[in-house]
Amino acid sequence: MKEIIKLSILGKDSIHIGLHLWPHITNELFTCIFSPTYVIITDSNIETLYIPSFKTYFISMAKQRSINSRLLFFTIPPGEKSKSRKTKALIEDWLLSEKCTRDTVIIAIGGGVIGDLVGYVSATFMRGVRFIQIPTTLLAMVDSSIGGKNSINTSYGKNAIGTIWQPERIFIDFTFLETLTEKEFINGIAELIKTIIIWDESEFASLENISEKIAKTVRSMSLTSNKHSKFNEIIKDLKRYIISSIKIKAHIVSIDEKEKDLRTLLNFGHSIGHAIETVLAPYILHGESISIGMVKEAELSRHLGILNPNVVSRLIKCLNTWGLPTSFKDRRFKEVILGKKHLIEDILEIMSIDKKNDSNNKKIVLLSAIGKTYEKKASSVSDDDIRTILSQNILLYGIPLNAFQKHTTITLPGSKSISNRALILASLSNGICYLKNFLHSDDTYYMLSALEKLNAAEFKWEQDGDVLVVKGKSGYLENPQMELYLGNSGTTARFLTSICTLVQPNSRENHLILTGSNRMKQRPIGPLVDALKNNGCCIEYLELENCLPLLIKPKEIGLYGGNINLSATVSSQYVSSILMCSPYAKTQVTLSLIGGKPISQPYIDMTISMMSSFGIKVTRSHSKENTYYIPKGCYTCPSEYIIEGDATSATYPLAIAAITGGSCTISNVGSASLQGDSKFSEYILKPMGCEVVQSPTTTYIKGPPKGKLKSLGSINMESMTDTFLTAAVLASVAYEESKPYVTKITGISNQRIKECNRINAMVCELKKFGIEAGELPDGIYVKALNTSNLPYSVEGINCYNDHRIAMSFSVLACISSKPTTILDKACVNKTWPYWWDILNSTFKVQMKGIEFDLNPTINSSILHHPSECTIFLIGMRGAGKTTLGQLAANFLGREFIDLDSIIEEDIKTTILEFIQKYSWDVFRRKELHFLKTLLTEKKENYIISCGGGIIETEEARDLLISYIEANGIVIHIHRNIQDIIKYLNTDKTRAPYQDNIMHVWERRKRWYNLCSSHQFHMTSTDPTEFKKNIPLNLKSSFNNFLRTITGKNNIFSLILKKKRSYFLSLAFSDLENIFSLLDIITAGCDAIEIRIDLFQKPEEIDKYPSLEYIAEKIFLLRQKTSLPLIYTLRTTNHGGSFLSSEKKLAKEYILHGAKWGFEFLDIELDIASELFKTINNSWPYTKIIASYHNIEKPISCDDFEWIQKYKEAQHYGHIIKLVGTSSSIEDNFFLEEFKSKFINKKVPSIIINTGIKGQLSRIMNTFMTPVTHPSLPSKIAPGQLSIKEINTALHIMGLLPEKKYFLFGKPIKHSQSPNIHNLGFEILGLPYKYQLFETDSISELKEILHLEEFGGASVTIPLKTNISILLDEISDHAALIGSVNTITRTYNNGQYILKGENTDWQGIIKAIKNFNKFEKSFENFSGFIIGAGGASRAAIYALLSLGISPIYLINRSKDKLNKLYHFFNTNHIIPITEYHELNNINFDIRIGISTIPTDNPIDPSVLEIAKIFFNLKRKSSEGIFLDMAYGSNTTDLTIIAKACNWKIIHGLEILLEQGSEQFLLWTETYIPYNQVKYAILGPNK
C-alpha cells in the first residue's frame, strides 16, 4: 500500500490523502467504520469511471474477511440541477424502500454536488447517519469535502438549505485528478488559491512562481495520449499545494466549526462569487465565479485603503495564469456575462441573503496583505462600496469645495513604457535583475504573461509585489504551443512581433500566433511586419491586412539582421521593437528610419538609453539621418533597475490641481525623466498660468485660481502626443475674455490609431459638456467655456475602452456642477488600476457605481444610435445609393448629400475627367479629405451617399469603422452583382474601373461588410428603370427598414399593449413558395417568423445557403408584407436543422439578421449570452427573443433547470421564450403554475409546451403565440394551432365570450359594414356578430348600449354629432372633429366604459396615403371638400392633419358652412357657396373630397363650382378625388373628375379603411384586409 498522509480535523485524523486508495478505503470501512449496509451515492458520469474498481476491492476484501455487509448503489444525473429537494426526497424514499436504518454508512463519491447533497441526506436521514466523502474533483478535495457543510439549492438561491454534519472520513485520492478535464482541474485551483492567499504568504509566493509550469502541463495533458506521464511531472508540486490548502481549512474548521467568526475567512471571494454564480448559473463554474469574487473583494479592500494595490495585481496575475476569469470583461468570462441587465443589483440582492450577514449588514472578507486579513472574521461593508467595485461605470460627484486648493502628494505607478521595456531587456539578459516600482496593469500583465509562455525568463515577486525578480535566459525563447492573446495592448503587440522572431523552431508546431481584442485587430502593425519580412522573417496576416492576428513561423536563423529599413511615421514602438531585438540578430543591424520624420522621438531615445543600462550601446549615425547601428551581443542586466513613475499618468493629478486652483507634488517623475511626457508641466501647465517647480525626480505645480487658466493658442505636441487629451480638457476651460479662447493642438495624428481614434473621441465627449471642438488634419481645436458657465454632461462619457480618455474626463468631472458618469471605468486598468481609489481617497471625489439600466439617459445616449445621427450609404457603383439616399432623405426629413457631387463642385469638372487628368490615387485622396470633413461637420440629420470605392482607402475604412463604433449608421446598399455588371457595362459617363468588375466586387465585399452597420439588399430590378420609377413595394420596405434601424418604429410597444398577440411560423426552404398566400395566412398576426435554418438553395442541398441568397429571399418578403419579421436560426440541440456544433457560423448568420434590420431576433440562450451586448450596442432597436427549447420534458416548477433557463433568458432577452413538451394534459397545468410563480411581468414571455397534448399551453399563452394556418402545407411544430382554432378554443373554455356589434343610424339598410366586420370575425374565429340597428333617435340606444354582450358600435348619420351625450368619454380626435363614428366598450377598475372615437378621418388619410404612398408631405398642396354634414367634419380634420392648406368648403348652405368654419376656427378653411368667390385661386389643388350621400341630389350650383376645381391647372400631373358615397361607383362628381384626369377613390374603399380602424379598436387586430376587400369590392380592386 502507498504512503497515506493523515491530517487532523476537529481532533480526529479523518482526512486521508494518497494515491490509489481503494484498498485503503475498503480496509478503513471494515475496520473502523463497520456497517451492515454501505450505500454508494454517485452520479452517472462517475459510476462508469470508478464504481467498478471500488466494487471489486469491496467484494474481494469482504470475501477474505467473511463480511456479509450489503453494498447498495444509487445513481443520480450529474450537474447542479440534481442538488434539489426533489432529488433529496428520491434518495430518502429509496433508502427507506431498501430498509436502511440508522447504522447505515453512506458514501459520497463525486464532486461538490454529490458531496453537498449526500451530506445533507446523511444529516437528516434517521436523524443523522454516518457518511464518508470521497471527492473526485480538485474543487471538492480542497473545499466542499472538508468541514462538514452540506446543502441543496432552491429557486431562491444556491445552498439555501443545509446543515453542518461532519463526515467520518475524507479520502483524498490524487489518482482521480488524472481524469479531470482542463476546465474541471482549473475550476478547483480557484479554491486552492483562495485558501492559501488568506493564510500563508510564503506558500502563495511559491505557488505564483510555479503556476505557469503546472498550468502549462495541465493544458498539455489534453493534447497528448501519454496523459499519465504528464501527470507524474506535476504530482509532487500539486500534492504540496493541495495539502497546504487542506491543512489551512482543517485548522480553521477545528477552531470554529459552526462558522461564528474565523471560519468565515474561508468565504474570501465567496460573498460576491456565490452571488455571481447564482445569477449566471449554469454557464459559470463555481471556481470561475470565486475567481471573479476574489478579485472584486480584493479590489474592495484596496478601495477602502486596506490593501496594497500590488496585491490585487498579483492575485489577478496568478488567477490569469490558470486561465481563470478576473473581471466582468475577461475574454474567458464575457461570453456569459455580457448583456446581463441589472447584473449588479441582482448580485447585491443575492448577497443580502448570505449566511454571514449580520441583520442588514453585508459581510465580506477583506484582505490586508497576502496571508493576512483585515479582521479575523468577515467585515461589514456598505452596499455603495460594493456597488462601486462591481459596477462597470462610475458616477463622479466632483471635488467638494472644502477640498479645493489643498495640497496633495502622489506617488505614481511605474511607467508603462519603461516597465514593458525593462521586462523585455531583463528577460533577454543573462543575469538576475530586481525591477522596482514595476507597473501592475493590464498592459504589463499581457507582456509578462506572454514572456512566461515563451519561457523567456523566470519571474518571482518579492516585497509584497513591489519588486519583480527576473532571471533572464540570454534570448532563448520557446514556442508556447498556444496563441498569445495580448488584449488591446499595442505596446505588447508591437514589441513581441519582433521578439517572437527569436523563438526556436519546434518540431511539433512550427508557428505561433499573436492576437488581441477586436480593437487591437484594427490597429496598424504593417510597417513593422514589412520591415521584418523584408529581413527574411516569415509572418502572415490571418485576418485584415496590416493588423493582428499574426502567424509567425520561427526559423533557425531567427532575425537575420544587416540593413533594415523601417517606416516610423506612425508609431515609435516599431522602432523600439526592432532596436531591442537587434542584438540577437545573426549579423549586426543597421536600422534606417524612412518615409519622413519619426513620430515620438523621445520614446526612441528612451529605448536606446535603457538598452545602454542593460549593456548594449546603440550608436546614431552622424552622416545618415535617422540611422542607428546596433551591435550584436547579449544584454547584461544591472542588479537593480528602478522604474520611474508614468509621466503620462502624472498629467492627471497635476491637471486636477491646475483646474481647481490646488497644488500637487509628483514624487517620482522629474526633470531627469527618460519620458518625453515629463515635459508636460513645463511646456503646457506653465504657459497656462501654473507655477511649476521640478527637481530631477519630483514635479510640483500650483494652479491659478479656479477659472483663470490661460489659453495656449496653438501648440505642437508631437513630442508628447499621449498627453494631448489632458491638455484638451484643460483647454476647454481656459477662457480669457480679452484673448482668443480657441486652442489648437497639432502634431498628434498618430492618436487616431491608438486604443481608439482619440481625436474623434475627444471631440465627441467634450460636446457632452457643451464644449465645441473639432478635428484638424493632424490635431484638434477646442473652444473654451468659462468654468462658471460649464454645463454638466447629462450623458455618460464613452471611454472607448481607452484609459487615457477615462482619466482625462475625470479631471473635467472634478469641477462639473453635477455628477458625471464615466462609462467602462475598468479601462484604467491598462496603466493605473487604482486611479478611482486615488480620486476618492486623495482628492476626496465622491463616487458610486452605476449600471446602464439604472440611468435611462445613459442608456439612450450610449447604447442607442443618436436618433438623428447622419446615415452614410456605401456600396458598389450602380447599386442604387443615390436613388435610395434621396428616398431616405424624403422619408426621414433630412438633407441629402452625394459625396461625388460635392467633389465635382470642388474640382470644377467631372470625376471621369479628373481621373483621366490626374489618377485614381489623387482622386482617392480628395475623396478621403471630403469624407473626413463630412464626418466632422455633418454629424446629424443628413443622408450621405459615398462613392463605390470609398472603402478602397484604408484610412477611409478606419474612419467608417470608428463612426460605427461611435454608434453611427452606415448602410451597405447591395444589389445582385450580375445586375450591376449589366448596368455598368452600358454606362459610359463614369470613370472606368482599373479591374474587371467582378474582381472589384470580390475584393471589396469583405470591406463593405466590415465598414457597414446595416445592409439593405435591392431585389433584382433594372437599374435604369429603377431610377425612373421606384416600385412602391420597394419604397415601402425601405421605409420600414429605415424606421426600424433609427428607432422610429413602435411595433414592439404596440404588441405589448395587446391582450393577445401572435406570430406566424414559416417553415419553407424557399419563401417565394408562399408569397401568393401571404395575405391569407398572416390574417390576425402581429409578426412573421422566418426559420433561416430551413432555407435551402435548390442546387446546393448539401450545405447551408449563402448569406447573399438568404438576404435576397428576405428582402423579397419585405416587399410583400409590412409585418415585422422574426429572424430565427434554430439549431439541432433545440429541434432545428442548423448543426449546434457550427456555433461560430451560427453567430455570423444571426449578426447578419441584425444587420438586415430585423425587428426581432430569436436567439438560443447559449448564443444569446454571447451576442446580447453586441446586438444591443450595434443594433439597439432590434429586440432579442432569448429562447430555450427542451423537447424531452415539460416545463415545471419542480425542475430547477427551467427556473435557471427562465432567469438566464430574463437577463439576455427583451422577450423570453421557453418551449418544453407535454406527455399529459397535466403538464400544461404545471406550466401555468410555473408562470404564476416566476413570470416577471416587466419582461414579456412566450412559455409553451409542444406536442398535441401541449396545445392547451398555446391556447393559454397570451403574448406572441406561434401559430400556423390551414392553408400552409405543414405545421412547423407538433401541436401548433391557427388563430381561428385558438379563438374557438378560448370561446369554448369561456375565456372569449360572445359579443354583439351594431351599426346605428338611418338609412343604413344598404350598408356594407355588416359584411365587412362579420367576414373579419369569421376568418379569425371570433364569436362576435355585427348587425344593423336602424334609428335616428339616440333615446332608442340607451338600453342596447348597456347589454351584457354589447361590444361596440359604428355610428353614421344622423347620430354622429349628438350621440356623445350617451357616452362616458370621447377621444381627443372625436372631440376636435365634433363627431363620433365608433363606440368602444372596455372594462376598467370594475366598471364598463363607453368611449366615442372617430375613424372616418383615419380612413380618409389611409386611402390617400395608400394611393399616393410615399409623398412625405402634403404641405404645399390645397384641397376642396363638397358637403357640410357630419362626414365633412372628418374630411376637414383629415386634410388639416395632412398639412393641406387652404381647404375650400363647397356647399349651397352658407349657414352650415359658417358653422363648420367657426367650429374649426382656422384660417386654413375657405367657405365657398357661390361661383364668384372663386377668383384668384393660385394654389396647387391636389385633393378633393365629396361627403354627399348617394341618395342626395347635388345642387347644380355646387356642381358648377366643383367643375371649376376639377379643371384648375395643377402643378402635379395627378389629383386625387375621394367620393365617400357608399352606393354607386359612378356619380355626377366622379364622372366630371374622371374626365379631368383625376384619380378616383370610391366610398367603399374609404369605408373599408375606416372599418379596419374600427375592427382594430374592438379586437386589437387589423381586419384580414385583402380577403375582406376582395369579398366586398371584387377581384379588380
UniProtKB/Swiss-Prot annotation:
Residue positions binding NAD(+): 43-45, 80-83, 111-113, 116, 136-137, 158, 176-179, 187
Gene Ontology molecular function terms on file: 3-dehydroquinate dehydratase activity; 3-dehydroquinate synthase activity; 3-phosphoshikimate 1-carboxyvinyltransferase activity; ATP binding; metal ion binding; shikimate 3-dehydrogenase (NADP+) activity; shikimate kinase activity
Pfam families for this protein: DHQ_synthase (PF01761), DHQS_C (PF24621), DHquinase_I (PF01487), EPSP_synthase (PF00275), Shikimate_dh_N (PF08501), SKI (PF01202)
Region listing for Shikimate kinase, in residue ranges: 868-1065
Stretches for region 3-dehydroquinase: 1066-1285
Residues binding ATP, per UniProt: G875, M876, R877, G878, A879, G880, K881, T882
The reaction(s) this protein catalyses: 7-phospho-2-dehydro-3-deoxy-D-arabino-heptonate = 3-dehydroquinate + phosphate; 3-dehydroquinate = 3-dehydroshikimate + H2O; shikimate + NADP(+) = 3-dehydroshikimate + NADPH + H(+); shikimate + ATP = 3-phosphoshikimate + ADP + H(+)
Residues reported to bind Zn(2+): E191, H270, H286
Predominant cellular place of this UniProt entry's protein: cytoplasm
Cofactor: Zn(2+)
Pathway field: Metabolic intermediate biosynthesis; chorismate biosynthesis; chorismate from D-erythrose 4-phosphate and phosphoenolpyruvate: step 2/7; Metabolic intermediate biosynthesis; chorismate biosynthesis; chorismate from D-erythrose 4-phosphate and phosphoenolpyruvate: step 3/7; Metabolic intermediate biosynthesis; chorismate biosynthesis; chorismate from D-erythrose 4-phosphate and phosphoenolpyruvate: step 4/7; Metabolic intermediate biosynthesis; chorismate biosynthesis; chorismate from D-erythrose 4-phosphate and phosphoenolpyruvate: step 5/7
GO biological process, one term: aromatic amino acid family biosynthetic process
Keyword set, alphabetical order: Amino-acid biosynthesis, Aromatic amino acid biosynthesis, ATP-binding, Cytoplasm, Kinase, Lyase, Metal-binding, Multifunctional enzyme, NADP, Nucleotide-binding, Oxidoreductase, Transferase, Zinc
Location of the region described as Shikimate dehydrogenase in the Swiss-Prot/TrEMBL record: 1298-1581
Positions of region (3-dehydroquinate synthase): 1-383
Active-site residues (renumbered): E259, H274, C827, H1189, K1217
PROSITE patterns referenced in this protein's UniProt entry, alphabetically: DEHYDROQUINASE_I, EPSP_SYNTHASE_1, EPSP_SYNTHASE_2, SHIKIMATE_KINASE
Family recorded in the similarity comment: In the N-terminal section; belongs to the sugar phosphate cyclases superfamily. Dehydroquinate synthase family. In the 2nd section; belongs to the EPSP synthase family.
Stored NCBIfam families: aroA, aroB, aroD, Shik-DH-AROM
Role of this protein: The AROM polypeptide catalyzes 5 consecutive enzymatic reactions in prechorismate polyaromatic amino acid biosynthesis.
Description of how the protein assembles with itself and partners: Homodimer.
Record protein name field: Pentafunctional AROM polypeptide
